[in-house]
UniProtKB/Swiss-Prot annotation:
The keyword Ribosomal protein does not apply. It is found in: Cytoplasm. GO terms for molecular function: thiopurine S-methyltransferase activity. Pfam families: TPMT (PF05724). This is Thiopurine S-methyltransferase. GO terms for biological process: methylation; response to metal ion. The gene is tpm. S-adenosyl-L-methionine binds at W10, L45, E66, R123. Gene3D superfamilies: Vaccinia Virus protein VP39 (3.40.50.150).
Amino acid sequence: MEAAFWHQKWADNQIGFHQAQANPYLQRYWPGLGLAAGSRVLVPLCGKSLDMAWLAGQGYRVRGIELSRRAVEDFFQEQGLQAQVWQQGAFEVWCSGEVELWCGDFFALRAEDVADCVGLYDRAALIALPPQMRERYMGLLSQILPVGSGLLVTLDYEQKLLAGPPFSVADEEVRRGFAGWQVEEVEARDVIGESPKFLQAGVKRLVERVYRVQF
């Protein structure tokens, strides 16, 4: 999957993955992580997610990583924020208050870029990637993150019925990819009744899983 795919999605405003409000799982389970206010939270492949505004509103410092400059611009504009912009290595950094969005290729991240990130929030990153890229993604996070904790949300369905993204990620793949982490499933829910696109494709079961992870 090339970068051009996502640039085109944003250019065409084909962003069905964007949610119009903060994610309920985030609001329900994040407080249980026990991360101190002021902790830095990494949000990979963040888009213009309102979850980042929610985290900042709870007193956390957010570092989102996003390929699309359009998404980054939209986030700050829609939040009514003026951003300072500078170049840092392979990334263009946009910053306002407690939120930094790093515009560039996630796979260019280095350990020093996330050395202060003791929180992780992934609602739509892992499931946005095809299998080989998921393996790279999980491997990189496992390699570069310091000690910390976070939340991961996945989808699990019969992949052959529908081409991703979002892609199906089985429980076994999560546990294998993050083998060095403590991975605890805290909720699993069949949401097929809320998902017309999947119903039309003949999908019978669409399971959203929420994991608490410690790394």
